[in-house]
Amino acid sequence: MMLITTSHRPTRRTRSFGHDLERVIPNSLYLTRGKKTIQELLMEAYDRGYERLLIINVWKGNPLKMTFIKVHPEDWGYLGYLYLHGVKLQREMGFKGLNPIREDMPLVITTAKRVGLDHLAFAQVFSELTTGKFVPRGDKSLLSIADRYNTDVLAVIERHPRGIVINFYRLDITKDRPVGPLINVKIWIMEDGRRWDYKEAFGIKVPPRRREFEGKRGEGKNSD
């Protein structure tokens, strides 16, 4: 599904986050970046048969941004970006040493039962970024959705006071609670112009200086 790596000189927490994603995104691989360029990463992803390259960027020791890139020898390109408030690792949720999923199964992306249009829109966006399968929740249980699509792993989009949360479930591990990682998304931006910012959505005013700083911070920590 995707090759997962980081920006240069990642922190231990960022590497752990990458490994956690490898454990909940089927047929994915976490790769230590080293000195590899974007082009070298794309070629490695293509040689391994992946459709996506995910690069995790760091800010003050924590994962700041997730950059998704389409893998194609002649038509590669940036697809979109998730800016994060923070993450909660699997070990912080009580799960250690989970094995990656090497079976051929879809990553099903759905929502909690009572969410707004913003959450539905993001669930569809996240499915595009990951090549996952978006399934509207309705009144269905997670177990019934998983059974219908023959999968053990679901990404559930949920409400959060400071944005949108992605919670991952591994039903082969436990059917009672998510295993993580938990990802708190504050902004998402797609290259085709679609975007969402929790401050704008919640009517929070941002001082001009802070807005300018946040923009530069995101630019300064790009994927290369």
Curated annotation (Swiss-Prot):
Record bears the keyword Nucleotide-binding: no
Any single biological process term in GO: rRNA processing
Residues covered by the Brix domain: 1-196
InterPro entries linked to this entry: Brix, Brix_dom_Rbsml_bgen_prot
GO terms for MF: rRNA binding
UniProt keywords, alphabetically: Ribosome biogenesis
Matches recorded under HAMAP family: BriX
Job description of the protein: Probably involved in the biogenesis of the ribosome.
Protein name: Probable Brix domain-containing ribosomal biogenesis protein
Organism: Pyrococcus horikoshii (strain ATCC 700860 / DSM 12428 / JCM 9974 / NBRC 100139 / OT-3)
